[in-house]
């Protein structure tokens, strides 16, 4: 990309990543190594702080499965924990933003069961298990 060929004006680098969701779907064990390597590669290339501006997994509120499988609340919690672990291991990560705060309506599709369900809260603003995991994460910081 010619815009990035001279990174003089580039202050920070932002990426959206969905390892184990859109890439390697359902393979939770791929998140940490793939996210960590991706973050390190971008940082090595541009030598700038990185913000992960999107990461998330669709979850049907109330769906529980062990071992965790896609769309279960347990999967979303583990998904977020593995991404957080990768980001926390890189001191150049300047921020992160879960996609999304709450579920919202979108067009229908194979990956859109009654809207986007990547929220840590439902459309009615009721917490999913992930909301409690994220609360715990930030209270411990």
Language-model features, listed with the residues they occupy:
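Substrate-binding/catalytic cleft of secreted carbohydrate-active enzymes
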Residues: 1-134
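Surface beta-strand/loop "capping" patches
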Residues: 138-141
């Amino acid at each position: 990309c010619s815009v990035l060929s001279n990174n003089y004006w580039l202050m920070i680098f932002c990426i959206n990543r969905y390892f184990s969701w859109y890439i390697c779907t359902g393979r939770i064990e791929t998140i940490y190594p793939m996210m960590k390597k991706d973050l390190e590669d971008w940082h090595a290339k541009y030598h700038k702080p990185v913000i992960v501006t999107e990461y998330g997994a669709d979850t049907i509120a109330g769906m529980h499965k062990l071992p965790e499988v896609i769309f279960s609340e347990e999967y979303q919690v583990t998904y977020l924990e593995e991404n957080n672990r990768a980001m926390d291991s890189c001191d150049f990560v300047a921020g992160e933003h879960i996609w999304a705060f709450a579920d919202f309506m979108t067009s229908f599709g194979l990956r859109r069961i009654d809207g986007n369900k990547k929220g840590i809260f439902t459309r009615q603003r009721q917490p999913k298990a992930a909301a409690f995991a994220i609360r715990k994460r930030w209270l411990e910081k």
